[in-house]
Curated annotation (Swiss-Prot):
It comes from Sphingobium sp. (strain NBRC 103272 / SYK-6). Its EC number is 1.14.13.-. Monomer. The three-component monooxygenase is composed of an oxygenase (LigXa), a ferredoxin (LigXc) and a ferredoxin reductase (LigXd). Optimum temperature is 25-30 degrees Celsius. One of its GO terms (cellular component) is cytoplasm. Binds 1 FAD per monomer. It catalyses: 5,5'-dehydrodivanillate + NADH + O2 + H(+) = 2,2',3-trihydroxy-3'-methoxy-5,5'-dicarboxybiphenyl + formaldehyde + NAD(+) + H2O. The keyword NAD applies. This is 5,5'-dehydrodivanillate O-demethylase ferredoxin reductase subunit. Belongs to the FAD-dependent oxidoreductase family. Disruption phenotype: Disruption mutant shows growth defect on DDVA.
Length: 412
């Protein structure tokens, strides 16, 4: 039975970064990493962008060269999924029957793409965009498929729509809510991206629930039936409706949690010597008014990896990183800092018609987040306003010619 001083579950950004940091910070114990995927750790953001577009080959999105892991004394177990955890024994079992013991365990299981639960939801020709295998499957049908229906108007759906539109495909994007990005951004940003996608030929359908997937005699998807009975003919369907956190073994072993596994400020779960980081970790975040949230981003994965590793090596520092995120669509670069979940006011800097503007989110007059489209200077300078929760003068904030670094606290 292999034993590791630190065993990591998950080969995504969080798990890989934890392994990298253990060695960078001179952890001398044994390190193992178990991943359900058969691939060496790789970047996920390019999957719905450059990789899907065929602009980057897989080797260019590897997080490290293949020989790095062995050279660093990090043992990889690829294609293995953890089935059960025995916290009292500090051991776990994989689906193949392999058993491991550990001193410390870092759970970076991430999540699996959420599937449609409607009739026809298991038909052939339905795809997700979560793993390399997912995107390879989409790319395999590109030569034959001309009509794509994308279910979900979040970032994954919008990025996939942009790539497919640029490839000359006929794209219909279906969103259940009344605007895209409704869960993460204000209506100004939603309207801007809706207009952009329509200008590029995407048929954007809002407030449309999916009733069923139509399929032929071979159980291959031929259309998406909406709640009002409308059928969108399609050759392929991409489902981008979020993820389900991969935390089953932890919760079954008694860890606290629900939508994710609960962690404290050092990324420790309620189980002894077990940490959780990345997409699956529900933590209290001061940028969300102290609410317990899961943040699905590379930033969160990397920063929580550092928090867990520093605690393991005896230099603890509580997690307090400012959230940030980016999205590329067409020739647009969106950069986000902070969390807009609890804002009560928005100020727009610049004119969206120029395709260069920012939306600043306030709570009781204090800056809590920014969405910046083709406006990197606002993103860079606005970060400090978010970190400090700066109270700003709204008139100066709305003046696009006033650098954010010059804003001073409003009086009164």
């Amino acid at each position: 039975m292999p034993h590791f001083d630190c065993l990591i579950v998950g080969g995504g950004h969080a798990g890989a970064q934890a392994a990298i940091l253990l060695r960078q910070l001179k952890f001398e114990g044994t390190v193992g990493l178990i991943s359900g995927e058969t691939e060496y750790p790789y970047e996920r953001p390019p999957l719905s962008k450059d990789y899907l577009a065929g602009e980057k080959i897989f080797d260019r999105i590897l997080l490290r060269p293949r020989n790095f892991w062995g050279d660093q004394g990090i043992e990889l177990f690829l294609g293995e999924r953890v089935k059960a955890l025995q916290p009292a024994e500090h051991s776990l079992t994989t689906a193949s029957g392999a058993e491991f013991t550990y001193g410390k365990l870092i759970w970076a299981g991430g999540g699996v793409a959420r599937r449609l639960s409607c009739p026809g939801g298991t038909a052939k020709g339905l795809f997700t965009v979560r793993t390399r295998a997912d995107v390879d499957a989409v790319m395999a049908v590109l030569p034959q498929a001309e009509r794509f229906a994308i279910v979900g108007g979040g970032y994954i759906g919008l990025e996939a729509a942009a790539v497919l539109s640029k490839l000359g495909k006929q794209v219909t994007l279906i969103e259940a809510l009344d605007r895209v990005l409704a869960r993460v951004a204000g209506p100004e940003l939603s309207a801007f991206f809706e207009d952009e996608h329509r200008a590029h030929g995407v048929d954007v359908r809002l407030a449309c629930g999916v009733e069923a997937i139509e399929a032929d005699e071979q159980d291959r998807a031929t259309g998406v039936r909406l709640a009002d009975g409308t059928i969108i003919p399609t050759d392929a369907v991409i489902v981008g409706i979020g993820i389900v956190p991969e935390t089953g073994p932890l919760l079954l072993a008694g860890a606290s949690g629900g939508n994710g596994v609960d962690v404290d400020e050092y990324c420790l779960t309620s189980l002894p010597d077990v940490y959780a980081i990345g997409d699956c970790a529900a933590h209290e975040n001061r940028f969300a008014e102290g609410r317990r949230v899961r943040v699905e981003s590379v930033q969160n994965a990397n920063d929580q990896a550092r928090t867990a590793v520093q605690h393991i090596i005896g230099t603890p520092a509580p997690y307090d990183a400012v959230p940030w995120f980016w999205s590329n669509q067409y020739d647009l670069r969106l950069q986000t800092v902070g969390l807009a979940v609890a804002h009560d006011e928005r100020v727009v800097r610049g004119d969206p018609a120029t395709r260069s503007f920012s939306v600043v989110y306030l709570r009781q007059g204090h800056v809590v987040a920014l969405d910046c489209v083709n406006r990197t200077k606002d993103y860079v300078q606005g970060r400090a306003l978010v970190v400090d929760g700066t109270r700003v003068d709204r008139d100066r904030l709305a003046d696009a010619d006033t650098p954010l670094k010059e804003l001073t606290a409003a009086q009164g």
